[in-house]
Amino acid sequence: MATGDLKRSLRKLEQVLRSLNYPNEVDYVGLIKGDTAASLPIISYSLTSYSPYVAELLMESSIELIAKNDVRFTDTVYKLLRDQFDYKPILTKKQFIQSGFAEWKIEIVCDILNCVMKKHKELIGLDKNSSCQRKKNVSEKPEPCSNSEKRPAEAVGIDITGRFMTSGKKKAVVIRHLYTDEKVGVPEGTVTLADISQGCSESAEQSSDIRIPEAQDPEVKAELQDICDHPEITALQIALAECQEKLKQLTWIEKRLERLEAATHGKVMVDEKAWNNLLSRVTLLETEMLLSKKSESVERNVASQDCESISDVDFVPYDKNYSVGGAAGNYRSSGCSAVSSETAPGSSIVNYCVLREFSEETTIQKMERMKKMFEETAELLKCSSR
């Protein structure tokens, strides 16, 4: 397939879509690839949303195009084109659903759009003809109106010469002023001044009858007059009504508060931040206790190891001298042993006392810190309870 033919068909499709006022975006990449999903939205819009006349035609022929998959949609479209538009596409259903045949698919879409626009114009012409025929039928029907009903509708006027004129094509009628009470000499079809005055009096009576209901409600008129005369009173009444509504809301809120108090009776309410602070302090105390226990055990182990090392240092040289030397060596070794036996316990006691004093100082400091933290937590609890 030549690329020039494909471009030409795409330009043709763009022109048809402009004349159709297609609002959505067109998937040109899918159309070039021959993807069926790119052309189905255009066909669906043209048949369902473009023309209300075409949509009515589909409804009358009981054709549904909504909520269907691609295969069923193409099947119904092909049937619709065959039955309503007398159009047979170049491709079969299987070929149209398959990928490919890009140029032929674009041509089919253009043909469908042109068929829809042509059908739309035909239906508009039929609708116009039917409406014109109805208007003609209505105008041809005679209006059932009597002569007595026509007279009030006509414009009435009196000429300067005393002639009684009407707006129609009737001849002017001369009013004869010289007549008896029995209307002798008055021809038929003439209208006298007495008749005109009688009609005016009847219309005045009708207007008075219409105005009677307004006069039947003097209380309403009095209230309206009071409102117009005293706008401050109306404003006060409105404010009073608003205050009453607010009082009702307050009573409802008080009842709800009482229910909440009854539900939370005996429970301690603590702020979330204070509670989190308290939990963090408790965890710190627990960790410090564990660390202090571990440090004490480590110090004891170190002290025991120091004592053992001191005892080993004191007794090992004595054994060596005793095994190697003679009499003099024995004398010297005995002196050394005496010194070591006197000095070793003293040094071990001193080291143990120093370690004990150091450990006591650290424990006292830790206890003071813990005491301070406990006091702070107690104050926080008091503040939260208040």
UniProtKB/Swiss-Prot annotation:
Annotated Gene Ontology cellular component terms: centriole; centrosome; ciliary basal body; cytosol; midbody; spindle pole
- Single biological process term from Gene Ontology: centriole-centriole cohesion
* Cysteine disulfide partners in this protein: none
Entries under InterPro entries matching the protein: CEP44, CEP44_CC
- Where does the source fall among the domains of life? Eukaryota
Which residue windows are coiled coil? 232-263, 359-383
Pfam families in alphabetical order: CEP44 (PF15007)
Which GO MF terms are attached to this record? microtubule binding
Q: Where in the cell is it found?
A: Cytoplasm, Cytoskeleton, Microtubule organizing center, Centrosome; Cytoplasm, Cytoskeleton, Microtubule organizing center, Centrosome, Centriole; Cytoplasm, Cytoskeleton, Spindle pole; Midbody
Which parts of the sequence are annotated with region: Binds with microtubules and centrioles?
11-194
* Principal localisation: cytoplasm
Q: Which UniProt keywords apply?
A: Coiled coil, Cytoplasm, Cytoskeleton
Instruction: Give the protein's biological function.
Output: Centriole-enriched microtubule-binding protein involved in centriole biogenesis. In collaboration with CEP295 and POC1B, is required for the centriole-to-centrosome conversion by ensuring the formation of bona fide centriole wall. Functions as a linker component that maintains centrosome cohesion. Associates with CROCC and regulates its stability and localization to the centrosome.
**Subunit structure, briefly?**
Interacts with CROCC. Interacts with POC1B; the interaction is direct and recruits POC1B to centriolar microtubules. Binds to centriolar microtubules.
- The protein here is known as Centrosomal protein of 44 kDa
The organism is Mus musculus
Q: Which lineage do the record's taxonomy fields give for this organism?
A: Eukaryota, Metazoa, Chordata, Craniata, Vertebrata
Give the gene symbol: Cep44
